[in-house]
Amino acid sequence: MCGRFTLTVDPAEFQDKFGNFTFPKNFAPRFNIAPTQPVLGVPNNDRFKADFFMWGLVPMWAKDPSVGNRLINARGETVAEKPSFRGSLKYKRCLIFADGFYEWKAQPGKKSKIPFYIHMKDRKPFAFAGLWDTWNSSDGSLIRSCALITTEPNELMAMIRRMPVILHPRDYAKWLEPSAQTPDQVSPMIDPLSRRGNGCVPGQHAGQQSVYRCSELVVPAK
């Protein structure tokens, strides 16, 4: 499960990294993005324009938007079968941008867990494989929401737990294909990223409480 991530890169550098997409001109660095908060993503609507989604998928048929609190992650192994996710996998896929994420490792015999901050070795931003949907309330308001797809861990993450699917740049266009896609067409992209691209360091506090939002969260623990 992925329950916290970061997006701290300068907007100008971000635009250089993802030149095929259009982004908001300004967005503040965020060191502890938590469920129900807005996240930056690009939907597969053929416009290649980034916008903000609420993290926690609310299917269009949901009776209450609070269901999104429980639908922050979709397991890659079962995403094509689960009613909450299978429609979005077929019709509504998105990229969710980040430059790192947090995970916690249990310590034998202890209640406390060791926090880890996982990022690319070059500290560059990347894109998670996401699903999105829209939900209309009775008063006409609209909620656009998303979930991150998770997968089995690579060698680096195996010592901790599962990991979110980080898409290879060559797969961005295929993932954002606006037409309907079958599970067989998208499943090859739902794989753990090679360890060669990841770095992993113990973090300070590591964002287990969403009120922590300072840069100290991503400083390696001493």
Where are these regions (language model features)?
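Short linear sequence motif anchored by a di-proline
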Residues: M1-K222
